[in-house]
A protein has these predicted regions:
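Sec-dependent N-terminal signal peptides
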Residues: 4-13
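Alpha-helical segment of the N-proximal tetratricopeptide repeat
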Residues: 17-44, 61
Length: 149
């Protein structure tokens, strides 16, 4: 599958309920320190979905995709639909990078159902869906031309 660069922010730390120090470390690109900070927060407040989201984002930017995925999966269990939507969006982005397109599309769609006004999710969903449809059309065209030979 051809790669499509989608220029949107991976995660926006605009949650008013997120931890200031973690956001500051993240924004300063001190991802390892942010990871440690969020781990400490989660030891004190297990199940803190905002901290899981912060941990996931910090881990992602620190190239620790496994930790990022686990953290986003935990955050996706939140009762808060905005956090849940952001977590699903981030999982979808990771799966998209792994070429798990069908799973990614399903998660983008679910994130949009939770937060229909999320422009980044809407853009990624539509672009990925278009890319998948174009690829399917190209495959059908190739099969048709091979049959004619």
């Amino acid at each position: 599958m051809s790669k499509l660069s989608i220029y949107v922010f991976f995660f926006s730390f605009s949650f008013s309920f997120a931890q200031d120090k973690g956001i500051e470390l993240f924004n300063d690109k001190k991802y390892s320190e942010a990871i440690e900070y969020y781990k400490k927060v989660l030891k004190q407040r297990k199940g803190d979905a905002a901290a899981e989201l912060g941990l996931g984002s910090s881990a992602y930017y620190n190239d620790n995709i496994d930790l990022a995925l686990r953290s986003f999966e935990e955050a996706s269990k939140s009762d808060n639909e905005i956090i849940q939507s952001k977590a699903l969006y981030n999982i979808a982005r990771i799966l998209q990078a792994k070429d798990e397109i069908s799973k990614s599309l399903k998660l983008y769609k679910k994130a949009l159902e939770l937060n229909p006004s999320d422009v980044d999710t809407k853009i990624n969903y539509e672009l990925l869906k278009k890319m998948k449809n174009q690829e399917q059309q190209e495959n059908q065209d190739q099969e048709g031309s091979q049959e004619q030979q």
